[in-house]
Each structure stands twice: as C-alpha cells, then as structure tokens.
Amino acid sequence: MKIALEAHAGQKDLDGNPAILHPLAVGLMGNSDAEIKAGFLHDVVEDSSMTLEDLKNKGVEDEVIAALALLSHDKEKVGYFEYVENIIASGNVTAIHVKLNDLHHNLQRGKVSYEAAVASNDEAKIKELGRINAKHEKALEMIKNADYEK
C-alpha cells in the first residue's frame, strides 16, 4: 500500500477526489494476498513513472508482478477490449479477479458521477461518463462470460 500511496501522491480522479481512493478500494475487494496487493498497485504503472522493474526492486512478489504486467494497459499499442481479452486469455486468476474488482468499482463510482452530472446538467460530462460506463459494462460482461478457472 505504501508504494501505491507514493505513486499516486497528489493525483486526482475525474471528480477531483484523491486518485489513491480507487486502488485502495480495489485492493480491499481482493480475496487473496496477491489480489489485495495487485489491487492496490493495479494503476501504478499506468498512472505514474514507476515501472514493473521498479516494483520488483521494491520487493513486490513475482505473482503480483505477473498480474500487474497484464493489468497495465498500454493504450498506444493495444485497444481497450483487446487488453481485456488478453487478461482473460492469460488465465491469470489474480489479474482476472483484480480486473473484475476494478470494473465493479469503476462502475459504482461512475454511476455516482453520472448522477451528479445529470443533477448539474453538465452535458459534456454526461456524455463522457455514459461512454466510459458503457465501456466498463461491456468489459465486465466479457469477463463474466469467459471460460476461466474461477
């Protein structure tokens, strides 16, 4: 958790909340030590200057590093749904469970943000959040319908 706090220091989410709240929530949803650790760290490589090698040098276990390698989305190289398909195809249960937890939490907070945007008549935010929520709902269905060791 200390690594995640360091990596996300000063970052804000779309609603202006501390960005660390999301990885903390995802980590707390984990059912194993690896899922908890990977949940806490799942956005570190995407959203900070830390690399997988940095995390390994800080003592993060190989099982967690393997999950994080799958969970770190290189948006310039791989489309979102291909990224989700790659997580599923890997069969890495830790990565799959963390992605499920990530999606559940993103949808939960996305719906709250959407309702706030509707209440304030923020048309641009309504449109953007609608797009993001639809993407997350589709990804969630992809994983729920996938055949993997649960």
Where are these regions (language model features)?
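Active-site helical microenvironments for divalent-metal-assisted chemistry
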Residues: M1-K150
